[in-house]
């Protein structure tokens, strides 16, 4: 399972909101880039960021802060908040962000997501599905649409989306545990990578997400409140995450001349994924 430690940016500061309410703000740092470096040092392989001001205003606000976060670390960064046009996407990618998260526009204009995928590639486009009581919220969670989270997720899959960040707004910033059931439904019904967001409060919550077969989890307040030790979580849930580097590939200890061929001149083999142990 991939872990995504989160940095929410408001007025250039690292903050957390309760249930997405902009009048319920806790400031954790005036230097978000230092938080990012700490996450990388703890072993994080990916960092999640949100421009909260941008989400509310509909355009990027904290560009310089996001740029400094990206330049301070060597791991990829994903970012959401205020991305409404193809030009916005290009601007954010130019900041050093690896992939962008699009929420409101996915609801209002699904064709925009297809155009974004066609132009930038599916690996750089993530859709944010943020729900209140099962219905998708937009514009910084200030408005609720008539679309269900599942219907939007399925529609996004049909146009080529490979990754969705699912947030249960009622859980966000509350340290009350994630909505595992609904997140698993999205994962099972769509078959694409679902990243759970909202409510992570302890290692047990991460275990439940992992056991449900969900691709990833975003952790925010639980790290800042020292309820989850990021380094310990990375060691437990991402034990094979860094093995993608060539230097970590296992080396064969047998030469070809030692192998026995069958009657057809072929070598019978069992192929196993060296990261997760799955027999392919």
Identify the residue ranges that each predicted region occupies.
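Catalytic cores of alpha/beta
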Residues: 73-99, 181-219
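C-terminal helical cap(s) of enzyme catalytic domains, especially alpha/beta-barrels
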Residues: 113-119, 187, 206-244
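Glycine-rich, proline-tolerant flexible connector loops at the mouths of alpha/beta enzymes
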Residues: 46-64, 104, 109, 165-176
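Flexible "arm" and connector segments at domain edges
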Residues: 239-280
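Charged helix-capping and loop-helix junction motifs
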Residues: 60-67, 142-151, 176-185
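Conserved anion-binding
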Residues: 11-23, 90-93, 97-172
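Structural preference for beta-strand elements that scaffold enzyme active sites
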Residues: 2-6, 46, 74-78, 98-101, ...
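Conserved, mostly hydrophobic/aromatic
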Residues: 8, 39, 47, 79, ...
